[in-house]
């Protein structure tokens, strides 16, 4: 099973930059999108062979997730947990026979870490949610998780220390998640690979210079580790400030 995750930074804009051609090229069983900034009624495009599920923020033109899938899920749910987490369209959970798929757009901690307190609450509650799902069947958790977990996961760790996405608190929460029975699929296959990034600032020619961050992930329940066929970052794909990440599972 081939799964793709991509923060498209506005799907309407990405549609004008080859999104449908990318979908044909990717030939994925499931495509998970973050930061769609689109409501379902605005989706005036054809994607034959895929069912489409949307979770939009209350605020127009903000956040949002989508799952496009060839296989009809057993169930689909939106958001999770407390009411505070249910207004920004950040999570879709699709249940398949072999696993739960959780597509997530994690809240950014913002400049001066002004939203860090909420981010910590989100991380704890989402980890509890994933662990609860994992008691029933394995979990595939993907998306823009807005954290570079280790120094190897960004080009300039020293100058970005305590910036949003590389604060001690954020990477500690990722460490805690992985210690709770989950595996970062890319690092499982490539523990020492450098220069592997999924997001680049639009400033300072960051993408040209590969001054990036790896903040987009596929994370799976530990018991799916032996099912991982490949985990890749398609850095050559443009259309957003992020690139797609890809997971192939033998399920």
What are these regions (language model features)?
Residues 37, 43-109:
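Structured beta-strand-rich core segments of catalytic domains in phosphoester-bond hydrolases
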Residues 81-82, 107-123, 158-162:
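Surface-exposed cleft-lining segments at the edges of enzyme active sites
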Residues 1-47, 51, 57-63, 78, ...:
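N-terminal, active-site-proximal structural segment of metallo-dependent hydrolase catalytic domains
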Residues 7, 23-41, 101, 130-151, ...:
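Active-site beta-strand/loop signature of hydrolases that rely on acidic residues for catalysis
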Residues 70, 94-97, 221-222, 247-251:
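Active-site beta-strand termini and strand-to-loop segments that position acidic
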Residues 1-9, 98-110, 142:
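Active-site-proximal beta-strand elements of phosphoester/diester hydrolases
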Residues 60-75, 204-226:
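Conserved beta strand-loop-helix elements of the APE1-like EEP
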Residues 30, 51, 122-211, 215:
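Metal-dependent phosphoesterases centered on the DNase I-like endonuclease/exonuclease/phosphatase
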């Amino acid at each position: 099973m081939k799964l793709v995750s991509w923060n498209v930074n506005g799907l309407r804009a990405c549609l004008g930059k080859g999104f449908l051609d990318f979908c044909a090229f990717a030939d994925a069983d499931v495509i998970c999108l973050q930061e769609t900034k689109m409501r379902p009624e605005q989706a005036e495009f054809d994607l034959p062979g895929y069912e489409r599920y949307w979770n939009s923020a209350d605020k127009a033109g903000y956040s949002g997730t989508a799952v496009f899938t060839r296989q009809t899920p057993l169930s689909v749910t939106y958001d999770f947990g407390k009411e505070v987490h249910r207004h920004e369209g950040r999570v879709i959970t699709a249940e398949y026979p072999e696993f739960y798929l959780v597509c997530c757009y994690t809240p950014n901690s913002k400049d001066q870490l002004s939203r860090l307190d909420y981010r910590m609450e989100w991380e704890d509650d989402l980890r509890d949610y994933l662990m609860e799902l994992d008691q029933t069947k394995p979990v595939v958790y993907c998306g823009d998780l807005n954290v570079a977990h280790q120094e190897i996961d960004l080009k300039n760790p020293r100058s970005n220390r305590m910036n949003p996405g590389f604060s001690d608190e954020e990477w500690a929460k990722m460490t805690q998640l992985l210690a709770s029975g989950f595996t970062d699929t890319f690092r499982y296959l490539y523990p020492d690979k450098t220069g592997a990034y999924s997001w680049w600032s639009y400033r300072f020619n960051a993408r040209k210079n590969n001054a990036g961050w790896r903040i987009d992930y596929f994370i799976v329940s530990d018991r799916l580790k032996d099912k991982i066929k490949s985990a890749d970052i398609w850095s050559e794909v443009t259309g957003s400030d992020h690139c797609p990440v890809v997971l192939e599972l033998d399920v």
